[in-house]
Structure formats: structure tokens, C-alpha cells
Amino acid sequence: KWKIFKKIEKVGRNIRNGIIKAGPAVAVLGEAKAL
């Protein structure tokens, strides 16, 4: 029961880390498109 919860937690952390890393890149791409 708890293993599933831990797995979800790990996936959520990976997604959050990915968003944090991707955030600046997305912002730069957005500015490049705006120009």
C-alpha cells in the first residue's frame, strides 16, 4: 500500500524538478518567439 504512495511521490518530485529546469528554457523560447 505504501509502496504505491512512495512511487507517486517520486514521480511527482521528478515532474516538479523537470518543470523547474524547463521553466527558464520555456521563458526564453517564449521571448524568442515574441521577438
From Swiss-Prot:
Residues modified as Leucine amide: L35
Gene Ontology terms describing biological process: antibacterial humoral response; defense response to Gram-positive bacterium; innate immune response
Keyword Secreted: yes
Pfam families: Cecropin
Alphabetical list of PROSITE patterns matching this protein: CECROPIN (PS00268)
InterPro entries per the UniProt record, alphabetical: Cecropin
Keywords noted in UniProt: Amidation, Antibiotic, Antimicrobial, Immunity, Innate immunity, Secreted
Primary role: Cecropins have lytic and antibacterial activity against several Gram-positive and Gram-negative bacteria.
Annotated protein name in UniProt: Cecropin-B
Species in which this protein is naturally found: Antheraea pernyi (Chinese oak silk moth)
